[in-house]
């Protein structure tokens, strides 16, 4: 990974396992929140991750002790994956994708353009 991509928020979308992996660096860039929201704008094709408060009914608790190998926070949701595939019909079932985004640290939000996906190599997708 180049130094430039090491400084960008990143998430992986795994359609085979119906999960989104939010890399630890992304959470760190957001201020290591205890709760996050995952937002999808179908019209603009954007995904957003932002820190939130425990009282937010749309918030997801980040169980930091369960971060996969200390690197990723995982969200498993078949319904979410189906929604993302309706937005991006070119995404293939049983494939994994990586998206690099941009972080506005002062606003506590990371934005990802779904058009900027990179299909992951099969060897990397079989973790």
What residue spans do the PLM features occupy?
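Acidic (E/D-rich), amphipathic helical modules within compact regulatory domains
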Residues: 27-46
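Mature exported/compartmentalized surface modules and terminal targeting/interaction regions
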Residues: 1-2, 7, 42-43, 50-127
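Short beta-strand-centered segments at strand-helix junctions
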Residues: 19-31, 75-84
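Short, surface-exposed charged micro-motifs
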Residues: 10-12, 35-39, 100
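A broad, low-specificity signal marking well-ordered, structured residues that form hydrophobic/aromatic
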Residues: 11, 20, 36, 47, ...
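Short, charged/polar N-terminal "headpieces" of proteins
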Residues: 1-29
């Amino acid at each position: 990974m180049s130094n430039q991509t090491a400084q960008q928020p990143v998430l992986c979308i795994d359609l085979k396992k119906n999960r989104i992996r939010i890399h630890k660096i992304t959470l760190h860039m957001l201020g290591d929140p205890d709760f996050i929201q995952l937002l999808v704008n179908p019209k603009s094709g954007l995904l957003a991750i932002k820190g939130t408060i425990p009282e937010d009914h749309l918030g997801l608790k980040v169980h930091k002790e369960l971060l996969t190998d200390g690197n990723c926070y995982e969200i498993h949701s078949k319904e979410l994956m189906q929604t993302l595939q309706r937005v991006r019909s070119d995404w293939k079932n049983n494939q994994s994708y990586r998206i690099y985004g941009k972080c506005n640290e002062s606003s506590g939000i990371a934005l990802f353009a779904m058009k900027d996906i990179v299909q992951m190599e099969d060897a990397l997708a079989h973790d």
